[in-house]
Amino acid sequence: MLRNNLGNSSDSKNEDGSVFSQTEHNIVATYLIMAGMISIISNIIVLGIFIKYKELRTPTNAIIINLAVTDIGVSSIGYPMSAASDLYGSWKFGYAGCQVYAGLNIFFGMASIGLLTVVAVDRYLTICLPDVGRRMTTNTYIGLILGAWINGLFWALMPIIGWASYAPDPTGATCTINWRKNDRSFVSYTMTVIAINFIVPLTVMFYCYYHVTLSIKHHTTSDCTESLNRDWSDQIDVTKMSVIMICMFLVAWSPYSIVCLWASFGDPKKIPPPMAIIAPLFAKSSTFYNPCIYVVANKKFRRAMLAMFKCQTHQTMPVTSILPMDVSQNPLASGRI
């Protein structure tokens, strides 16, 4: 049935499968095209900065690099396919395309949530438990990063093999979890995803950043040398950047979670069409505001970006080894990531 529906003409889909007019589709398509271009360009610049300046290749930034990869993945696949379908007036890429599109968006989205959790754990171990942080090696960070990617892959594959399903949303121009079919399979999948990939990560992040904040307050009020204050200033920059990213993650994914919860415990037919399209758009929005957060909240990254635009081949960034926490700030080297 879904395959047949996806094969219908643009006109019939606009009448039967989409709750939006073509003008509304065009507005969404314009947004997607602009946001996609900004996201791809900005995240490529982010990767270029990390590649160019070895001073930025720290364990925490290795996680940020992977976040940039997830953003590029959504921008290069999710935005173009959805924009093309909006311009067409209905889903343009058939049943297989729907599965690939929705699966990749869930894959990159869940991976980014996992990576943000890893950043929070890294900040906690680096600042609050430096003795543990010192023992974290290349394999430790690789394992944490791979865990985030594997988690994303698992939840992306489940609807394809039968736990819930992917289908076009009410606009008919994008594919996602089929929340209009709120059967037992959908409800169990949705509740598990929200618990494991929303509630648990937020709990871990809150715990980590709460204790990080206490540690930073303690050290900033103590009588420290200038070099110690400089090291803590760097740590505060990285932590501030991480906290802003978490807050924006909450803003981005909350509408989508609300839609899924509404569909699970209420009547999916009563979900307002604007909310149905705003939810996935919000979820994708982190792809273009994350690079802005790196620039605004991190002085080292900001200096590196300016240096790259000035075509400087090397940027002087003093790396200190005074504090135990320097494990998470030293450039990547053999034996450490």
Swiss-Prot record:
Glycans are attached at N8. It is found in: Membrane. CDD domains: 7tmA_Peropsin (cd15073). Gene3D superfamilies: Rhodopsin 7-helix transmembrane proteins (1.20.1070.10). This is Visual pigment-like receptor peropsin. InterPro entries: GPCR_opsins (IPR050125), GPCR_Rhodpsn (IPR000276), GPCR_Rhodpsn_7TM (IPR017452), Peropsin (IPR002962), Retinal_BS (IPR027430). One of its GO terms (molecular function) is G protein-coupled receptor activity. Its main location: membrane. Found only in the eye, where it is localized to the retinal pigment epithelium (RPE). In the RPE, it is localized to the microvilli that surround the photoreceptor outer segments. The gene is RRH. Signal peptide: none annotated. Residues 50-61, 122-140, 213-240, 298-337 are cytoplasmic.
